């Protein structure tokens, strides 16, 4: 399995380190030539969403990334990555940027995360939401979902902070900043399922 990490700006190194810990091959996408490499999934890290969007356009990556996601490439967006999935128009969510303001610019909280049928062994059986430490840094949140295809995976204080729509996973928090690998494992399972279905097809 090879996972592409968008490395234009932001916290991409932490994602790479997390995936390496899980034994996954990773490569950085900094230009169109990088993007053309074979890949089984994409991670869009946190950072500055306006800057990332501008760079995607300037480097000729905006449309290829959008088309790949629309074609079924598994993608995981964190923080600014969540905003970018909304900007790309691939994920049917309405996002509020920098929702927590400066006073709560950075904080951690434990809240339930719904891993569903992909619940790790540490979660209760039958599958149920598992407590997960979530780290937020000037985070957005999802104000509302715009399609029945979007499944809410986690909420904090009534605000949606994680969701999935088919091949797209998005979190307002930064799982790569904690030692817990479960959210990344969840995403890798999405990639494996896609690889399996493609092979069978």
Question: What residue ranges belong to the model's regions?
Answer:
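Pocket-forming structural segment of enzyme catalytic cores
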Residues: 87-159
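C-terminal and late-domain segments of enzyme folds
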Residues: 10, 106, 139-201
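Beta-strand-turn-beta hairpins that frame and shape the catalytic cleft
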Residues: 1-2, 129-132, 164-169
